[in-house]
């Protein structure tokens, strides 16, 4: 199954490059349909959290509208622990359960929302949508989103709202971010970005902030105890957990290498043009790499980094568009695609991303 997922966009990429922009849009749409099919038709065992969402969904037919936003929800049949869901996601579950009570439908609906938002985002923002799809697969974003559906919907709602910043429309931007927060509260960090992303950021800012974050992250365990004494218990527990996973640190390091490689292939003039034309990409890169740097000593920083990390699938194609020499650009794309593919194979040998392997269709479970 995974070989099909990887080979299919690669074939469509060749088609799109030969036939032009319109064919690339068709190729993107076809790829998204295939991605939706495998995401929607997976069994409850594909993705660690999938079974939890299915279990919760089955409780909504018994929940009244009056209790919709206050009812306790249990992600396991034994009801040994409780999961507090945001109001927007509760409303989605309730409306869907009225007409489609079968358990698989929540997976289908989550997948449809994720892929529809992905399609809208890539069509609007990516100059090379098929390369973005390749990175979406090989950087593990696709499989991660199978595991954390609420987060994925919230993040993509945030990304698709960024065009309001370019148009300087505060009200629709805030409304869309509040919609994202109604699916996952972590999306609240997108609210202040309206005033941050369009400042005149330079690549030296990215470098300095990432280096400073790495130093702070490495030193953080030394002062974690003092931080705990200054914060309430709930916050102290969140900000003092220091057993960072090596996987997230390695992912951050690989992201930094990809960005550095593309910058290395660009001339100084091309880099300056990128700085002046795409401050949004620079800021989001700085945010992601800095949070991965903090993750050296602060495990909770990885969750925040996950909000900005997926932006790389659009950032890299946009960076490549500033390379003026067609041969140099094509060679950089090829090296980038090969590096991402090799990284994916090695990562799958070491770690099962989001508990999504082995894959199984729901009707075969």
Task: Describe the predicted segments one by one.
Residues 22, 119-139:
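Transmembrane-helix signature of polytopic, membrane-embedded enzymes
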Residues 138-141, 172-196, 289-293:
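Membrane-interface alpha helices of multi-pass inner-membrane proteins
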Residues 93-96, 106-117, 151, 157, ...:
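Transmembrane alpha-helices of multi-pass, membrane-embedded glycan-processing enzymes
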Residues 130-148, 152-159, 186:
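Membrane-embedded helix bundles of polyisoprenyl
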Residues 158-171:
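Membrane-interface transmembrane helices that cradle and orient dolichyl/undecaprenyl
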Residues 51-54, 61, 67, 194-304, ...:
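Alpha-helical transmembrane segments and terminal signal-anchor/GPI-anchor hydrophobic tails
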Residues 1-35:
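Start-transfer (signal-anchor) and selected internal transmembrane alpha helices
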